[in-house]
Design a protein with these regions (language model features):
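Core catalytic alpha/beta fold that binds nucleotide/phospho-ligands
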Residues: 1-127
Length: 127
């Protein structure tokens, strides 16, 4: 396997808090999937939870070198947790096919937060 891309993003959590306060569900629905929104609302610190997912989506687009343009769309990238609570990325079928056409077979995600910041790193692998 070879590394096909690396992306990193850092988000100032108060920026997400401000967007939630100003735009509410409009902001949530523009950026996040229904599952992400539902999972966030079950949490005490919704903005922190969503900031980490926002950072993950941005890091993924940076790893591809494309930025946020078709087929990379906010809802095409979903951050969820596996059975052990480890974050992982689920892609839409269109985006998965796009990745496969560019020999990207695996994607790895790490998330962290500290005080007012959330950070994500994404590593893309292929042959």
């Amino acid at each position: 396997m070879a590394i096909r891309g690396i992306g990193v993003d850092i988000v100032h959590i108060p920026r997400i808090e401000a967007s939630l306060a100003k735009w509410g569900d409009r902001f949530r629905r523009k950026i996040f999937t229904e599952r992400e929104i539902t999972a966030a609302k079950d949490r005490l610190r919704e903005a922190r939870f969503l900031a980490m997912r926002f950072a993950a989506k941005e890091a993924f687009t940076k790893a591809t070198g494309m930025g946020m343009r078709s087929p990379l769309k906010w809802h095409a990238i979903e951050v969820k947790s596996d059975d052990l609570g480890r974050p992982e990325i689920a892609l839409s079928e269109d985006l998965k096919k796009w990745c496969e056409s560019r020999n990207i077979r695996y994607w790895h995600l790490s998330l962290s937060d500290d005080h007012d910041h959330a950070v994500a790193i994404v590593i893309l692998e292929g042959e």
